[in-house]
Amino acid sequence: MAQAKKSAAAGARTGKAPAPAPAPVRRDPERTRARILEAARIEFAQRGLGGARVDQITARAGSNKRMIYYYFGNKEALFLAALESAYEHIRKAEQSLKLTDLDPVEGMRRMVRFTWEYYLAHPEFITLLNSENLHRARHLKRSKEIQALHSPLVAMLEDLLARGQRSGVFRRGVDAVQLYISIAALGYFYLSNNHTLSTIFGRDLMRPQALQQRLAHMTDLVLGYLAKKR
């Protein structure tokens, strides 16, 4: 109050309006939480649960430990939240494909391409899953939302399969979950093992031409399996 009076008095003497008081800093809980999650995904992907450091996560997020414990409780809970966030990101991206608007064959082709290109663009997704598999999905088993998060994916594939069967281009008796596991495995195994595979076969499997060949091979395998035999 005294400072405000001094500013007003100074303004009166100089003929200038007093400078406005600085606006209070507004907290954005959602943005803070999102920054922490993004930093956690990177740290856990690089170092795993055991090697990841909360100090590094807070430094990446521009936050502090108090915020991590406030939002997530502990390091293991943060790891689970990072996993859920990673799955949520890919599932939302899949929904944006709008496969229900596409011809069944083109929709399946796009699904294969999307999965492959997503893995290439987000290598941290693969390493996060590798890390959780080392723990035998101990954290994901505690998730209350992970199965519901995947229901739209299964429904989307079931729709493609049903429309393809009705139009006579897809064979019957295909399980949507088994199909997705196969699509994911075709890219996941290649990328997660590219160092050893490149070494034992004497090829650079990550060069652009090799990646294009892999996508074409994956697409042919999936569509060839689904094709209705004449």
Residue ranges of each PLM-predicted region?
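C-terminal peripheral helix-coil segments that are non-catalytic and often amphipathic
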Residues: 1-20, 114-117, 121, 151-167, ...
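Helix-turn-helix
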Residues: 2, 35, 43-77, 81
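Generic hydrophobic, amphipathic alpha-helix propensity
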Residues: 32-40, 57, 82-86, 90, ...
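Amphipathic alpha-helical interaction segments
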Residues: 35, 106, 110, 114, ...
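Short hydrophobic clusters on alpha-helical segments that form packing/core surfaces
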Residues: 36-44, 115, 222
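Amphipathic alpha-helical linker/stalk segments
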Residues: 82-111, 141-144, 148
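All-alpha amphipathic helical-bundle segments outside canonical DNA-binding/catalytic cores
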Residues: 106, 145-149, 166-182
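Amphipathic alpha-helical segments used for helix-helix packing
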Residues: 107, 121-144, 194-201
